[in-house]
Amino acid sequence: MAFLWLVSCFALVGATFGCGVPTIQPVLTGLSRIVNGEDAIPGSWPWQVSLQDKTGFHFCGGSLISEDWVVTAAHCGVKTSDVVVAGEFDQGSDEENIQVLKIAQVFKNPKFNMFTVRNDITLLKLATPAQFSETVSAVCLPNVDDDFPPGTVCATTGWGKTKYNALKTPEKLQQAALPIVSEADCKKSWGSKITDVMTCAGASGVSSCMGDSGGPLVCQKDGVWTLAGIVSWGSGVCSTSTPAVYSRVTALMPWVQQILEAN
């Protein structure tokens, strides 16, 4: 059953740079590794980070939720020997003003299950805080009772594959606009695998794909971009007619708040 590929993302409030309000405005065509996505405007998704191993290999995405914290997917298997790269757009360029941040602690949700991919969320505490700027800032976290109804057009970003059988991932950050899909419609594709800690989006001609995992699904709420989902899993061939599955951040907020308050 080729149903497992995985993705994830998060971010909190900055001092001078408020959460969820990019200094450089994103421009989405709405048509838009993301399969059938498009290049993002550099710096327009300032919470997007790249998780890289010590060789510099990008293996997952993530989201800044504050200067000190990143949210990603548990299935990414992040270790403290990995690094968080913030402020990046073109992974093939060495001209960018990126921040390479060490990870002090990895908090994987203890209820995460690799077989059901439930509770697919990990928080990373940074060893040194990110320096917020016009290209590095946080996404807003939702309230537990926030609702992102079916049909809401949201955005996902990442450096994941643009075709499931592509030999390599794109160098430039990709973006796509995609609608939230109802639980009932999502279950038509995925059945009982879908639970209350998941949300679905896509089936609209675009899809997240391998390498996007851990990155953000963001929706505009009261004028700010809010983290609704973390790229988790989906079609093994990144089908653009099947919804992709994201960790439902509202359902996981009690655990997030518990970790942030205790650390």
From Swiss-Prot:
InterPro entries in the record: Peptidase_S1_PA (IPR009003), Peptidase_S1_PA_chymotrypsin (IPR043504), Peptidase_S1A (IPR001314), Trypsin_dom (IPR001254), TRYPSIN_HIS (IPR018114), TRYPSIN_SER (IPR033116)
Documented EC number(s): 3.4.21.1
Lineage of the organism: Eukaryota, Metazoa, Chordata, Craniata, Vertebrata
Main localization, broad class: secreted
Coiled coil region boundaries: none
GO biological process, one term: response to cytokine
Localisation: Secreted, Extracellular space
GO molecular function, one term: peptidase activity
Gene giving rise to this polypeptide: Ctrb1
UniProt name for this protein: Chymotrypsinogen B
UniProt signal peptide: 1-18
Family: Belongs to the peptidase S1 family.
